[in-house]
Amino acid sequence: MLGALKVLHNELSNLDFNVVAFQEIWLESSIKKFDNFAVFNSGLESKKHKFGYDFYVSGEFLKYVKGFKIINERISCFRLKAKWFSCTLINIHASTNEKNGRDKRWLLQLLKQNINQIAGSDIKIILWDFNTKVGNGNESLHDETNNNEIKMIQFVIPNGLNVRSTMIPHKDIHKETWYSADGRTVNQIYHVLISNRFRSATTDIRALRGPDTGSDHNLPKINFKVKLMVKTGNKYNEKRNMVNIFQNPKWKQEYAIKINNKF
């Protein structure tokens, strides 16, 4: 496993990745630090190599890590400190479209509870593997939708989130996040949700086809840049007192008398 992680680190370093969310790569719950990167792993309740979530962090970004929280085997949270805001990443893997609807509702309720616990000033980014085909976005790969898509939209709107992965224009090959073993079937089932307030900070989202990550998923890359609005205006633009009236000797004398009377 260590050798595979080093190969993965080399791939991610070549692509200039600093923080990466993974799924199903390590059995035990742990934080493993190496010379120039670290892996935060949520572990599993079962030993069947299903679920479990991980965050890879490059060495230069380790100093910005503020916390890693394991919710359960399907959800984990990762918090980073930035210059003006902190950023909370939520890695979630939901059931497939055919699974029990009650399990999906329970998972969404748990996700909502944890979102509500995040500081209001934080940038919230949800990395959503919900096996969802979204057919409503301007730049979605799919024309049709599935049941999971409806549940996601019902979750996004009341929680002040935006599905950015279907809003940024790209060729279809850069929207494909999953492919079948024979390469004939491709889907866009991995989505990026972000707080409405910071939706314009996502400058690019594209699925990379080249990295050798040992997965049947193409690795989506997110570029994120927050621009702060600077309040402009002349701070000296204040109403001036009518000092010209003191050029009149009469007003000048009356003003001096009133000032003396006050003391």
Enumerate the predicted regions with their spans.
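A shared catalytic/ligand-binding motif for oxyanion handling
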Residues: 1-263
